[in-house]
Amino acid sequence: MAAVRLARFNPGRRLIVCCAGAYHGWWDGVVAGLGSERALDDCLTLKDLDPVSLDVIRRRGHEIAAVLVNPIQSFHPNTPPPNDAVLLTSDVRKTDDSRDRYTEWLMKLRLACRASKVPLVFDEVYTGFRLAVGGTQEYFGVKADMVVYGKTVAGGLPIGVVCGRRELMQRFDPQRPMRLAYV
């Protein structure tokens, strides 16, 4: 939530781009479907690995606050994840060309975002540093503008960390970073 709010705050843009099938949490800022309390007119769902998606980002860049990418999508583009345990313990990463195809996709997405001045956000709340010591950025060799980490940072304890380029993080006072506590 903090990364999306921060992305929307900085450029004054409202539209968030998510990829089909990607999971970014259970809050109404990115979840569409039955039971949603509000219409998601500020969230756009595009297809992974599709050149049309890149064109949409280029054409609508002036409206887009950020593009969210969940690295788990590399194992099953445009579909919901089959099972969390299967994704991280199976040999699907080693026997499939999904890494190469998704790396190429992320590089093209990175270029489209940079050309449109749209922040690219890697949502690593689930994957964290499980794909590589340097996270998704190291695994795919593509730098994000902002990265979100979750429980993997704290050994399974509930925590969230948002990292980003200085100009994106300027909303936060370095002496008093945003803190949220739920009891």
Where is each model-derived feature located?
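Conserved N-terminal phosphate-binding loop of PLP-dependent enzymes in the Aspartate aminotransferase
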Residues: 2-183
